[in-house]
Amino acid sequence: GVSTRPRAVEGSYMPCFLAGWSQASCLAQILGVPLYEFSHQQGHIAASLWSAGRLDLMQVPHLAWHLSGGTTELLLVVPDGKNVKAEKLGGTSDISAGQLIDRTGKLLGLPFPAGKSIDALSRGSDCRDRYRVKLHGLEFSFSGIQNKAEAFYAATNSPADTARFVMNCIVTCIADATRAALAEKPGLPVVFSGGVASNSMLRERMREFSPVFAEPQYSTDNAMGIAVLTALQEGL
């Protein structure tokens, strides 16, 4: 199995996936075995379900957040037992949660990628300030938070409080959108996937939704999810 594109929708493409596809295609031909192609997003969701011991959700509809460096999307997943079939319900209309975190890291002089550093810094602050992003249906914009973070840091000169401020904003927005989605589709399980889903504050604040999270080390592990999906295709 191999990731061949960011999302399983028409027109989804990034050239970086060609290297993996080329190698996997050659190996499949040499070994005389099938080649199963999936999206990067499908891999992250499957990795979360496997790591959380919830592969049973491959049989039932659920909500899934894909939170990463390039993506912040809320999905309705209607799996068929072998693959993750998803419809986008909402998410960011501009920069992703991961991009916002990395840009905040750059502002604070942190190494790239900044996820772990922002997580550690934010835990050292009790700042409760936040900028509440408005929802438009289930869509929202994170670019305004970046501007607010720059102003906040200029006013406070506190890296820890700024990191906490940004995470307060992100987590509040994700929670608001999740509540709104559950109001439309009550009773569905909520799965969190992607690298940003390893953030400790996010994991704590989402408890009200009885969430399904991957173990932190598997939040960033797309390959594990691709292996799981390949095994399911083979009936293993």
Which ranges hold each PLM region?
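Short beta-strand-loop/turn "lid" adjacent to the catalytic site in phosphate-handling enzymes
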Residues: 1-23, 29
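A contiguous, well-structured pocket-lining segment that forms one wall/lid of small-molecule binding clefts
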Residues: 119-190, 196-213, 231-235
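Short beta-strand scaffold segments in enzyme catalytic cores
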Residues: 46, 64-66, 72-76
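Active-site nucleophile and cofactor-binding loops and adjacent substrate-binding regions
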Residues: 12-19, 35-43, 65-67, 94-95, ...
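Conserved phosphate-binding catalytic cores of ATP/NTP-utilizing and phosphoryl-transfer enzymes
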Residues: 33-63, 228-229
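Glycine-rich phosphate-binding/hydrolytic loop that grips phosphoryl groups
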Residues: 44-48, 214-236
